[in-house]
């Protein structure tokens, strides 16, 4: 099938921002002006098209990255029609996984900043993630109509706090309630958008006299930035003192794609000003799939291969999101890097080794969809009903296998017990949690062996709140949730030898199992090891796996406080048996008894998870932040200067970190942010351990 849009005219972009920068309203306006959306959805009244999960509408924050396709030919229809695929990304610290996975499949991004709040902590986190994937960016300073709006101040913060090189290509005309439009520094014209057409129409006027000097100054800086793109442009600029308009755009484009500059624009999405020109900038300065480096992967013969953005190459795509849809069931969102795929084709999942037949293919527009017959290089689409695909899997041509670089997903750090409010909902709850875990690799579900409770684990308190909320809304399962729990472990501090004997001989066939174990502590992270040193058949070899099994089950159930026993070596070195009464069950129980008694005598201790915490804080709050970390039993490992103040690195027990996000926010007026990941297990202090053991008895 012929392409409707040449791949050179594709733009795969993300809209990334801090929570309140106005990202969803900006995306809404994009959909409106590109003719997809005919009613303006406002976050304020919770009707935004992109935010298609009910909860997002309630909380006013964007959680899932919905993928949307739209078309644009420029404000004045000055470009041939381009196809823009937009991925909306969340801006909350608990959803960094969503941001990671969308950045992984984007070619460029528009970073939205609030003209009043400027660069917020979360902007720094998202910016770092975009640096990791080398994503070219534009900056859109939104909310120019708000009190306290200051475009150039925010541009300064992008330079100082994010270490980027922003180049204004517009200057605002007025600010706050007097914000009227923008000056286009390339054409040197003032742009005013028409209120009655909701900004669909605009007119170009002369630059207001009071802005002329400022516009000349920033135009000069912009042209210098463009001239640095190549020797040829620099020579022309030095000879003529000027550059033609086409060369300015060409130079800015080259440097943006190389990640050397960030063109900066401004507007007010809410007031329908500026988004139209920002869309023009997406066409002018963001890359097409052909302009980003080919994607690399591992081929069937273990050598490195790559795929170029071409329909002629073998098919290769990355599944970046799984979502369940109330109408069509399972949706797998994927980005096509090379080749063509038609519905009815078979693909190979290089991660799992399974083959999948492709049924329906959908082009998504936030919450409506259009069925399509095939997808091509550069497309972002969704497949319906794929069975065994998870986030990060590679789908490829079965005859040309390649495994694209996987996304890295963090380990969950917090868990809660969850149970349905009514017994009849148990099965529905299991199905719901299973589906949610497939959608989100940073969310895990397991059953606690001893209590039979269902335990869910995730990246933070808000993350788990939202999971429980989605169960209620999408699966109609009401659940009770326990308090957040820390994943403690148990181990021993000294070696010991211990006998375990299980004898039942009262009429009929009895039970007889008898073992001697040596238990020894192992280094951290070694786990459980079983060694068989039986000589002379004192324990027949058919019963030895049963001893191991009995010990293993006991390690999972814990000894002193019900937490798994780790880093321990159990050596079976002696025992005895009975010709008739010995059985696997008897030896399993004997092994378990010996292990349990031995651990109790071998100076058992409780281990607690220690988190690596990194806090980025303005210097004036450093003392407060460090004092607070010390109160939380934290050990400060080091400090360094950062673009936005100080970075404090510390190791803190997870048990002390609950509620930290809220405390840090209030202690620093929301200006500090932190990241936290698991580091290691350390012995818990005796007063802490004592309280936990007592609670478990």
Curated annotation (Swiss-Prot):
The keyword Metal-binding does not apply. SUPFAM superfamilies: EF-G C-terminal domain-like, P-loop containing nucleoside triphosphate hydrolases, Ribosomal protein S5 domain 2-like, Translation proteins. Keywords: Cytoplasm, Elongation factor, GTP-binding, Nucleotide-binding, Protein biosynthesis. It comes from the Bacteria. CDD domains: EF-G, EFG_III, EFG_mtEFG1_IV, EFG_mtEFG_C, EFG_mtEFG_II. It is found in: Cytoplasm. Catalyzes the GTP-dependent ribosomal translocation step during translation elongation. During this step, the ribosome changes from the pre-translocational (PRE) to the post-translocational (POST) state as the newly formed A-site-bound peptidyl-tRNA and P-site-bound deacylated tRNA move to the P and E sites, respectively. Catalyzes the coordinated movement of the two tRNA molecules, the mRNA and conformational changes in the ribosome. This is Elongation factor G. It comes from Nitrosococcus oceani (strain ATCC 19707 / BCRC 17464 / JCM 30415 / NCIMB 11848 / C-107).
């Amino acid at each position: 099938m012929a392409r409707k849009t040449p791949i050179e005219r594709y733009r795969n972009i993300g809209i990334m921002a801090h929570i309140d920068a106005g990202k969803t309203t900006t995306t809404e306006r994009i959909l409106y002006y590109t003719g997809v959306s005919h009613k303006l959805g406002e976050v304020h009244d919770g009707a935004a098209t992109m935010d298609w999960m009910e909860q997002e509408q309630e909380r006013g924050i964007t959680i899932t990255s919905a993928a949307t396709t739209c078309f644009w030919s420029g404000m004045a229809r000055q470009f041939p029609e381009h196809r823009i695929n937009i991925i909306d990304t969340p801006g909350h610290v608990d959803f960094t996984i969503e941001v990671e996975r969308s950045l992984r499949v984007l070619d460029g991004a528009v970073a939205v900043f609030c003209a009043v709040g400027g660069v917020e902590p979360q902007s720094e986190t998202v910016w770092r993630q975009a640096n990791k994937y080398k994503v070219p960016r534009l900056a859109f300073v939104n909310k120019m109509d708000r009190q306290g709006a200051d475009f150039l101040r925010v541009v300064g913060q992008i330079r100082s706090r994010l270490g980027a090189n922003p180049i204004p290509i517009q200057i605002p005309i007025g600010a706050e309630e007097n914000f009227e439009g923008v000056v286009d520094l390339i054409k040197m014209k003032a742009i005013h958008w028409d209120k009655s057409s909701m900004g669909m129409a605009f007119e170009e006027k002369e630059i207001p006299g009071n802005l002329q000097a400022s516009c000349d100054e920033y135009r000069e800086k912009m042209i210098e930035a463009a001239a640095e793109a190549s020797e040829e442009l620099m020579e022309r600029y030095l000879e003529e003192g000027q550059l033609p308009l086409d060369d300015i755009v060409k130079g800015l484009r080259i440097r943006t794609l190389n990640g050397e500059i960030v063109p900066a624009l401004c507007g007010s999405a809410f007031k329908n000003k500026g988004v139209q020109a920002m869309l023009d900038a997406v066409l002018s300065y963001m890359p097409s799939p052909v302009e980003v480096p080919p994607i690399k992967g591992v081929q069937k013969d273990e050598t490195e291969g790559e795929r170029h953005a071409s329909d002629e190459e073998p098919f290769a795509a990355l599944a970046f999101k799984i979502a369940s849809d109330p109408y069509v069931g399972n949706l797998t969102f994927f980005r096509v890097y090379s080749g063509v795929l038609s519905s009815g084709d078979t693909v190979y999942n290089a991660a799992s080794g399974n083959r999948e037949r492709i049924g329906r293919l959908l082009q998504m527009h936030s919450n409506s969809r259009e069925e399509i017959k095939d997808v091509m290089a550069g497309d972002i689409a969704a497949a319906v009903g794929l069975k065994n695909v998870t986030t990060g899997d590679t789908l490829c041509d079965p005859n040309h296998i390649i495994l694209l670089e996987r996304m890295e997903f963090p380990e969950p750090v917090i868990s809660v017990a969850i149970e349905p409010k009514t017994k009849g909902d148990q099965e529905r709850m299991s199905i719901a949690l299973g589906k949610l875990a497939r959608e989100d690799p940073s969310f895990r579900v397991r059953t606690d062996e001893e209590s039979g409770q269902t335990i869910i684990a995730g990246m933070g308190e808000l993350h788990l709140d939202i999971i429980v909320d989605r169960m209620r809304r999408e699966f109609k399962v009401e659940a009770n949730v326990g308090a957040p729990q820390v994943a403690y472990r148990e181990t021993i501090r000294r070696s010991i030898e211990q006998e375990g004997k299980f004898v039942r001989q009262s009429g009929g066939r009895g039970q007889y199992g008898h073992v001697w174990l040596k238990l020894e502590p192992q280094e951290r992270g070694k786990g459980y090891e079983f060694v068989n040193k039986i000589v002379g058949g004192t324990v027949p070899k058919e019963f030895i796996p049963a001893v191991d099994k009995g010990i293993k089950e006991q390690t999972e159930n814990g000894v002193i406080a019900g937490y798994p026993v780790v880093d321990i070596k159990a050596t079976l070195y002696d025992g005895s048996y009975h010709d008739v009464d010995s059985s696997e069950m008897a030896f399993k129980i004997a092994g378990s008894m010996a292990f349990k008694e031995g651990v109790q005598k071998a100076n058992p201790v409780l281990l607690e998870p220690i988190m690596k915490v990194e806090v980025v804080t303005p210097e004036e709050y450093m003392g407060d932040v460090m004092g607070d970390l010390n109160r939380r039993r934290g050990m400060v490992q080091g400090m360094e200067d950062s673009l936005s103040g100080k970075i404090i690195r510390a190791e803190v027990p997870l048990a002390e970190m609950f509620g930290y996000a809220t405390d840090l926010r209030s202690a620093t007026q929301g200006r500090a942010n932190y990241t936290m990941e698991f580091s290691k297990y350390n012995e818990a202090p005796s007063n802490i351990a004592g309280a936990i053991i007592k609670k478990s008895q």
